[in-house]
A protein has these predicted regions:
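N-terminal segment of the mature folded domain
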Residues: 21-153, 157-160
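Periplasmic-binding protein-like
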Residues: 110-119, 196-199, 241-267, 271-275, 280-302
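Ligand-binding pocket segment of bilobal, Venus flytrap-like solute-binding proteins
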Residues: 181-249
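Acidic, polar low-complexity linker/tail segments
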Residues: 296-348, 352-363
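…and closely analogous acidic/polar surface helices at protein-protein or active-site interfaces
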Residues: 344, 349, 354-394, 424-430, ...
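Von Willebrand factor
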Residues: 402-404, 411-472, 509-519, 542
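VWA/integrin I-like adhesion module and closely mimicked acidic/polar interface patches used
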Residues: 479-535, 545-546
């Protein structure tokens, strides 16, 4: 009995212990901590370095992630604190750092590589101009370039100076060389005649180098015979085998503007990751990879010597002075848009079919039109707005094309000397108000005769081009639905092919939202020299900003 009394507690204890062990959950597996992305906002010309995402992660453990945007759009995002990035990587940061606001946003910066602006001239045209001899080419000046443009002998492609770094730096190069000043320029120093002469040769605009290269390949020898861009881009184009003939690279004697690709820290909290990435980018192995992969010049002389066979020895000329004066930069952009560039003439083809009433699409379209006729004074807003001397036709359509209405923005006052931002005249404000009122009155009903509307608009632009050949013509069409009235895409292709040759100089840009047939729209822009903008994931007013950079 005593034995039983002793055994029972022991058995209970053992059973309890066994039960406890059986009920215990196994320890959870050790969780692998998530690697935070190190977000970098880069300008679009840096898409060729995207393989660095994987390379940096393997070498440093930092999960690098690029997002890409236009120069001025990205600059504005940094200036306003809306970049949503830990770092920025631009071709240069001279505009960004030209005032205290930009300087306050950038915590650290490291120059990574170099590429000077060059003038690429088709070899046969270089011979005609007497520029083919290396000794002669070495003595050419920005004035020689501007004179050839003025005389119609140099017809070039260039990214929009108001939205892209390379376009802006080329224009600044002309201004700096014409001033003959060794020190920084002011807005009053700008030689207006030099700008006017240079821009007479500007025949192929666009927002980025990729689009311009595609168009240059198609139009080399007919519409254009030169391409002004970074040396690295022109060398890559020469090596592509896609050109009708190679480009001779000219580096004007007075000097050039050079992109130094600063890698800039925006978020102090990510300093450690930034330093790891910057150190990797400046390492000898990465500098060699960048030079060979992108044809940009290493920042280290000893590394540059190892790739000397890839890069023209003439490229690194005197650096033209860049003024930190924001008034000069803003005044130059404003004068380019409103005074010096070939004025814009465009037809906006507006889908007013019944489907546009739903999903807030009508409101979005109306707001977008009102936006370009509004008073947004931001950097990109100034670029997107209707400019002085601009001519605009608004062409609604539904079952059929109807109600074409024309607007013309008057010219502003012209400064006798230098450049400066100017307020809108009362006459301009009246025209902008008329455009906004037109948008307010749009009614949505009926079907979608998209290709009829685009075709009629091209005919209108052709007729206007015959009367006023000095404008930059384009058609911009907005639609949310598949074409279900009038011409099919095949009908359009047939009829387009029968139009006069001059129509090839009028690009058609399509804005896609809703259920529009993306395949057909891409087929249309492929033959008309434009591109498709997708507004299904981006606000339409933001798409408008992008479109304006191509006009």
């Amino acid at each position: 009995m005593k034995l039983l009394r002793w055994c029972l507690p022991l058995a209970v204890t053992l059973l309890a212990a066994c039960g406890k062990k059986a009920d215990e959950a196994p320890p959870p597996p050790t969780a692998t901590p998530a690697v935070r992305e190190f977000r970098v906002l880069a300008t679009t010309d840096l898409r060729d370095v995207q393989p660095l995402e994987e390379m940096v992660f393997k070498a440093t453990g930092v999960k690098l992630r690029f997002s890409f945007g236009g120069t001025m759009e990205s600059t504005e995002a940094v200036l306003t604190g809306q970049a949503k990035a830990d770092a920025a990587w631009f071709a240069n940061a001279k505009y960004l750092l030209s005032d205290a606001q930009g300087q306050g946003r950038v915590k650290l910066q490291e120059k990574i590589m170099l590429s000077p602006i060059a003038v690429g001239v088709s070899e046969s045209d270089a011979r005609k101009l007497g520029w083919a001899d290396p000794a002669t080419a070495a003595q050419l000046t920005w004035k020689d370039i501007a004179n050839a443009a003025r005389d119609g002998k140099l017809r070039y492609a260039l990214s929009n100076p108001a939205t892209s770094n390379q376009g802006f730096m080329a224009l600044m190069g002309v201004v700096a060389a014409a001033s003959r000043k060794a020190e920084a320029l002011t807005a009053a120093d700008v030689d207006r005649a030099a700008i006017a002469d240079f821009l007479k040769g500007y025949k192929l605009p666009g927002d980025n180098s990729t689009y311009l290269s595609e168009q240059f390949i198609l139009q080399q020898g007919t519409k254009v015979n030169a391409f002004i861009n970074y040396e690295s881009w022109l060398l890559s184009l020469n090596n592509s085998g896609k050109l009708r003939e190679k480009l001779l690279l000219i580096y004007p004697k007075e000097g050039v503007s050079t992109a130094d690709y600063p890698f800039m820290l925006l978020s102090e909290a990510q300093r450690d990751d930034y330093l790891k990435v910057a150190e990797y980018l400046k390492s000898d192995a990465t500098q060699l990879w960048l030079a060979r992969q992108t044809l940009r010049r290493p920042i280290k002389n000893e590394i540059a010597a190892q790739v000397a066979d890839l890069l023209p020895k003439e490229g690194m000329r005197v650096e033209l002075p860049f003024s930190p004066d924001r008034a000069l930069a803003d005044g130059l952009i404003g004068a380019y848009l409103n005074e010096f560039r070939a004025p814009i003439a465009s037809t906006f083809v507006l889908d007013t079919s019944g489907s546009m009433q739903g999903g807030g699409r009508r409101d979005q379209l109306v707001q977008a039109i009102q936006y370009i006729a509004g008073a947004d004074a931001s950097l990109t807003g100034r670029i997107a707005r209707l400019n002085n001397r601009e001519r605009l036709w608004l062409q609604p359509f539904s079952d059929a094309v109807y109600g074409l209405t024309a607007f013309e923005v008057p010219a502003g006052s012209t400064a006798a000397k230098g450049v400066q931002l100017q307020a809108d005249s009362e006459a301009k404000q009246q025209v902008l108000a008329q455009v906004r009122d037109f948008a307010d009155q749009l009614k949505m009903t009926g079907g979608t005769a998209l290709y009829d509307a685009v075709y009629v608009s091209l005919q209108n632009m052709l007729a206007e081009k015959k009367k006023n050949p000095n404008y930059q013509y384009s058609v911009v069409a907005f639609t949310d639905g598949e074409n279900n009235k009038g011409r099919t895409i095949e009908d359009f292709k047939r009829d387009y092919a029968a139009l006069p040759e001059d129509v090839r100089g009028i690009p058609v840009f399509m804005v896609l939202f809703g259920e529009a047939n993306e395949t057909d729209l891409k087929a249309l822009v492929q033959i008309t020299g434009g591109r498709v903008f997708d507004a299904r994931r981006t606000p339409l007013y933001s798409v408008f900003k992008d479109i304006r950079a191509y006009q």
